Structures are given as C-alpha cells and as structure tokens.
Amino acid sequence: MIVIPAIDIIDGKCVRLTQGDYSRVQEYNLDPVQQAKYFEKEGARYLHVVDLDGAKKGSPVNFEVIKRIKESTSLSVECGGGIRDKKTINDYLLAGIDYIILGSVIFKNPEFVEDVLKRFGNERFIASLDFEEGYVKLSGWQEATRISVEEGILHIKKLGFQKLIYTDIKTDGMLKGHNFEAAKYIRSLFDGFLISSGGISSMNDVLKLKDIGVDGVIIGKALYTGHVKLNEIINLV
C-alpha cells in the first residue's frame, strides 16, 4: 500500500477544507513547495496536489506553484483541479507531473476524456470520484448530480481508467474516520488501482483500508494536525 500526503492550494497557499466547504478554509503553510519538501524529508515518495481555485473555476490557477513543487522535489506527483482541456494536460505533463487527475470532465465531456486517454496513454491518468450521500458531486464539490456511485464507477471503467481516487465528502477534513463500508463497496466494483481519500484520522484507519484491499491512501488534515505521523505510517504499511 502506498501513502500519499496531500497538498490543497488556494491563493498559492497550502490549505485544508472541511467537507469540501470553501468557506471553511484553514491555512497550514504559506509555501506549498516548502510543505512538499517536508513531506519528502519524512519519507514520502508520492504527493497528491489539488488546485482548489482551479477546481472551482474550471481552469488552472496555481499551475506555477505546482510546477515548482515538481521541480523542487523528487516526489511522484499526481495533480488535479480544473483540468478540462488538452492544453492544460499537455502543460502539466511537460512540467513533469506524473499523473493527471480528472474529475468533473469525466461526466461533463466523456468524449474528450476518451480521446485524451488514447492520445496520452491511460496510465498517466487517474479518475476522481467524489460523492455525498451516495451521489456524485462535480466542480470542486459545488455541483450535485443524481449519478450514483455505482453508475459513476461503471462509467469510469467504460472510459478505460485503470486508477481511481474516491472521496466521501461527508468524512473529508472531519478527522472522524473513513467510510469503510464505502471502501468495501467501491473495491468490489473497481478492480484497478484504488486510492482512498477522506476522513483518515489514525494509523488504524490506514490499516483497515489495507485489509480491505485498497492500494493507496491519501492523507491530508491528519498530517497537518499531528493525528498521524507520516514517517511512522509509511514504515507501518
């Protein structure tokens, strides 16, 4: 199992949201590059980066910061947030970003997604499925849909994704534990590389996900608050 620390960026700063609510923002580091270097020093080999401004706007806002993170570390970086056209994908890949995370565009423009997976290779892309109360949410979690989790995953598989990140918005940033029933359900539906996100509050949460058969776990707020020590959890799993 791989452990992936998370950096979310608003206004060029490292922040965390609570339940995806942009009005409940907490700043943790004015310099995301410095934060990435710290995670690397603690033993991280992977990094999850989201341009939250970009997710809301629908186009990149913090590209230069993310580019500097990649240039300043040897971390394998997966990046998402407002990536909805070929130029943006190309810019990120040319900047050395290892994996591109696609979310809303999967449901809003599936023909485009099918095309870029063929053009650039599906191994460079990760699908992101964000849901609340069993239904998919889009556009930085601001837009509700009536697409069920199962329908969303079937759609993602049909497009040809081999990697999937899922987030239960209700648990995200709450430090109250992960939705393990959702983890089991999604694991049963998706046989590719599965990454869990949202609600991790302890080492025990990570070990439970490992037992379920999840391949990777993204940890955000729990690292910033000290609930989980990155080097300890990496050594444990």
Curated annotation (Swiss-Prot):
One Gene Ontology CC term in the entry: cytoplasm
Annotated keywords: Amino-acid biosynthesis, Cytoplasm, Histidine biosynthesis, Isomerase
CDD domains xrefs: HisA (cd04732)
Enzyme Commission numbers on file: 5.3.1.16
Class of the enzyme per the UniProt entry, highest EC level: isomerase
The keyword Chloroplast is annotated on this UniProt entry: no
Lineage: Bacteria, Bacillati, Bacillota, Bacillota incertae sedis, Caldicellulosiruptorales
Gene: hisA
UniProt protein name: 1-(5-phosphoribosyl)-5-[(5-phosphoribosylamino)methylideneamino] imidazole-4-carboxamide isomerase
Protein localization: Cytoplasm
Catalytic activity: 1-(5-phospho-beta-D-ribosyl)-5-[(5-phospho-beta-D-ribosylamino)methylideneamino]imidazole-4-carboxamide = 5-[(5-phospho-1-deoxy-D-ribulos-1-ylimino)methylamino]-1-(5-phospho-beta-D-ribosyl)imidazole-4-carboxamide
